[in-house]
Amino acid sequence: MMTKEAPLIALVAGEISGDILGAGLINALKLHYPNARFIGVAGPRMIQAGCETLFDMEELAVMGLAEVVKHLPRLLKRRKQVIETMLAEKPDIFIGIDAPDFNLTVEEKLKASGIKTIHYVSPSVWAWRQNRVHKIARATNLVLAFLPFEKAFYDRFNVPCRFIGHTMADTIALKPNRAEACVGLNLDEAQRYLAILVGSRASEVGFLAEPFLKAAQILKQQYPDLQFLVPLVNDKRIAQFEQIKAQVAPELSVHILKGNARQAMIAAEASLLASGTAALEGMLCKSPMVVGYKMKAMTYWLAKRLVKTKYISLPNLLADEMLVPELIQDECNPENLAWYLGNYLADDADHRKQRNELKQRFTELHKLIQCDADAQAAQAVVDVLEANTSDQN
């Protein structure tokens, strides 16, 4: 058993979402080890929680192949720096938070030298490039997974994994407050709204804005009182969306919001959104949704051959059934999108019953992954530190 009251705990986050997770974990670990020291690569929230950072986390926050290639020399230099620092400092444990392309190599080197390692947030190995599970096994003492089907995947390969629940499920109420969301967005609660989320990446907005806007035009003809909420992550995406809208739907009135996706989905009767975290957030907001996704033809051709799952959206993966429509590539056209959304907007008894049943399933799935993830993650770290990893829940 470890008797050290002030362990040295190392953490590396590579983007904003990881910084949020890291800060929550640090604060939860302080309850176990008030005198612990935290070092690594941290963003502003982790630094505020007390983590010393080797360099600015933003240096690791690159997305897309072109960006990675452009910054590869710097990324490799920073990875070497992290490995050398950790080998010199000899932390009691190293926790790589997401950023698997960076962290798994660090973890593998450190584990080989006798340092305990945890990878926090499972890469999507269950969906594609499943052979990565062998590298994960070599690199980690334990994987912390947000979702139960991720743990089931690791169990098949005898890789230690603990399901801790999803932090997002801890931050959203089981019964979201629509009135509060409308007030927060300065919206009239008596109006009808549809939330349209075209994704956070430039490529997603480029592919999805046009079919999503054209679907909105069709719905506006059928439901003249329907209004559209379009939350976008930053000014660049807003400008990109407005440029596309000016070409394909100049006369359509929409409420463009900077951020506030969660409030928009709570305020709206239904959501049209890109696959990804937004679909999980929509489920937790109890928003009936249609998932649409388009990509380059070659990317789609490759994805069809590489992706190993029946579904692409997290609500369907969690439920292991087609709870919400998934319209991919050619099926992601305005007519299809509008037809499926119409099922959520129709006001007859049958459609109301279907909507209520869907929201009930969303609530059940919310409860499944609402486990106080920060506390669960901290307990897992304590167990590995104290070498009590036999019970992986």
Swiss-Prot record:
Task: Name the Pfam families for this protein.
Answer: LpxB (PF02684)
- What superkingdom does the record give? Bacteria
What keywords does the record list, in alphabetical order?
Glycosyltransferase, Lipid A biosynthesis, Lipid biosynthesis, Lipid metabolism, Transferase
Keyword Glycosyltransferase part of the UniProt annotation: yes
Q: What molecular functions are annotated in GO for this chain?
A: lipid-A-disaccharide synthase activity; phospholipid binding
Which pathway features in its UniProt record?
A: Bacterial outer membrane biogenesis; LPS lipid A biosynthesis
Q: What InterPro entries does the database record attribute to this sequence? A: Glyco_trans_19
Reaction catalysis annotation: a lipid X + a UDP-2-N,3-O-bis[(3R)-3-hydroxyacyl]-alpha-D-glucosamine = a lipid A disaccharide + UDP + H(+)
**Which terms does the UniProt entry file under GO BP?**
lipid A biosynthetic process
Q: Report the EC number(s), separated by commas if there are several.
A: 2.4.1.182
> What does UniProt give as GO cellular component?
membrane
Q: What does this protein do?
A: Condensation of UDP-2,3-diacylglucosamine and 2,3-diacylglucosamine-1-phosphate to form lipid A disaccharide, a precursor of lipid A, a phosphorylated glycolipid that anchors the lipopolysaccharide to the outer membrane of the cell.
Please report which protein family the annotation says this sequence is part of. Answer: Belongs to the LpxB family.
Protein name per the record: Lipid-A-disaccharide synthase
